[in-house]
Amino acid sequence: TISNVTTQSMISGSISVFSAAVTVTIMTYFGVPVSSSQAIVGSIMAIGLIEGGVNWAIILKLILAWVGTPIGGMIFGFISYKILSIPFNKIKSIYIKERSIQIATLIIGAYGAYSLGANNVANITGVFAGTIGVSTAALVGGLAISFGVLTYSYKVMMTVGKQIIELDYFSALIAVLGESITVWIYALLGIPVSTSQAIVGAVIGAGYARGSRLANKKVLLKILSAWVNTRFQLV
């Protein structure tokens, strides 16, 4: 889908990726979870507008998906919590509860990583798929994501995990599940979406299902503002 937004050469694709990378890096420095998919599409659109060719049908499909991503995360986070908390709360043994969370963390964490790889690797590497091949592009993208997680993700983790809404271990796990389901559905549809937006929506959904309230409305407004700016500042 990304590679079909407009015709890309290796040079224009590199410029698009660099522009998106700079934008996301700046936002990450300030601890704001933003969308790499929206950043790359914005930069690709800028190239397309300059060269006179943008596939507006695909752009419309992407915009609709972007609006639906945080909403979907919120819905799946809320529903998953309401359903799974019933059998979980019936467990009396603290040891069994802790073991259940540990096992579920491994399973849901693996599912979340799989969904991330299935969807988000294409955000950046999609522009190169026609030039260097899909397999090579996917490999490079996967390695780059791993490097980013290890070196530069702490501030965004703290924003999502502690500054939006209060979560316990169980609701945090459910939030990851809600995000993973949302991103995986879009991966099946071949639409690149934002895991950042999906997890923010899922965190809010799981938090409200638990009975929590927003910890800091200013942080949420800051995130929403950054989402809008990411979409348009490169166009």
Please give the residue ranges for each predicted region.
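Multi-pass alpha-helical transmembrane bundle typical of ion/small-solute transporters
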Residues: 1-235
